[in-house]
Regions:
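A cross-taxon signal for low-complexity, glycine/charged-rich
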Residues: 1, 7, 12-14, 29, ...
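Conserved beta-loop-beta/alpha segment of the NTase-like Rossmann-fold superfamily
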Residues: 102-208
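Catalytic-core segments of class I nucleotidyltransferases/pyrophosphorylases
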Residues: 163-165, 172, 176-185, 197-202, ...
């Protein structure tokens, strides 16, 4: 996760109740993706899922980082459930490194979440206890070496003309996405980033006379950093030159200089999965039954 130097000046956090405009579809009229009859239309969520995960290579050698599992489900699934809990069901996934693993997962989704019976003689398959999510997922090959900005530019044709969500495929939070969207719309900006305080990564030694008398977990950081969970206008694509553009550098810095970038301060839980230690910590939280990011029922 790259820290961005970006907080827009003198922006006050204002949270209001969500109005009916949140339900407007971000899908253009000529887009082939259609919402099923009776299905709630939602803002699109774009998830960056093309990275190699070099700092957690033990887990990402054969699969992309967003497919590393927590509790038997890819972290990508957990992120999508966070959005789904807020009524967001339309996803665009930016694939890259071993993107076919992500495509295969969704192509065989029922095989992962349901019991099935195969009648070999009749060449039939029966799915039991269907656990289908109300999701519409567009998987886009954005290149193995494409930078974060370039990946967004490559999926621009799927974004329509409305504001959309964007986040990284390796970070979890208990963020109120409806409040985030309302905050963004109240600021009259092109982009809003969720700012978070980084979790402590190293234990602090308490010593007395050269002897360790206690070990305390390092407290949460005090500086605000880029935590992902953006809300963006499609106009931000104009700030991206091409595949080589790093979203967290030139585009965000330009938006900040122009006063078009807001920061939504999230004081709650946020944790990236950058290392094997992070993965084990998140796995422990999930196994305890008290995972803070589990905002769905």
């Amino acid at each position: 996760m790259i820290q961005a130097k970006l907080i827009a000046p003198s922006l006050q956090r204002r949270i209001h109740s969500l109005d009916s405009s949140v339900g407007r579809s971000a899908v253009p009229a000529n887009d082939k993706r259609r919402h099923r009859k009776g299905e709630q239309q939602t803002v699109i969520a774009v998830i960056l899922a093309g990275g190699k995960g070099t700092r957690i290579s033990e887990e990402s050698y054969l699969r992309p980082k967003p497919m590393i599992e927590l509790g038997g489900k890819p972290i990508l699934w957990h992120i999508m459930k966070i959005y789904s809990a807020a009524g967001v069901y339309d996803f665009v996934i930016c694939c890259g490194y071993r993107g076919y693993v992500i495509k295969s997962y969704f192509a065989n989704y029922f095989m992962h979440v349901c019991d099935v019976t195969f009648d070999i003689a009749r060449n039939q398959m029966q799915v039991h206890q269907s656990a289908a999510e109300p999701w519409k997922v567009t998987l886009v090959d954005t290149g193995e070496e494409t930078m974060t900005g370039g990946r967004k530019k490559r999926v621009a044709k799927y974004l329509g003309t409305e504001d959309f969500f964007l986040t990284y495929g390796d970070g979890l939070a208990d963020i109120d996405l409806k409040a985030l969207l309302e905050f963004h719309r109240a600021q009259n900006v092109l982009a809003t980033v969720t700012s978070v305080r980084p979790p402590g990564r190293f234990g602090a030694l308490v010593t007395d006379g050269g002897r360790v008398i206690n070990i305390r977990e390092k407290p949460q950081g005090t500086s605000w950093i880029n935590g992902g969970f953006f809300v963006l206008s499609p106009k931000v694509i104009n700030y991206i030159q091409g595949d080589h553009t790093v979203w967290e550098v030139d585009p965000l810095e330009s938006l900040a200089r122009e006063g078009k970038l807001a920061a939504y301060e999230h004081e709650g839980f946020w944790h990236p999965m950058d290392t094997l230690r992070d993965k084990n910590q998140l796995e422990g939280l999930w196994g305890s039954g008290k995972a803070p990011w589990k905002v769905w029922t």
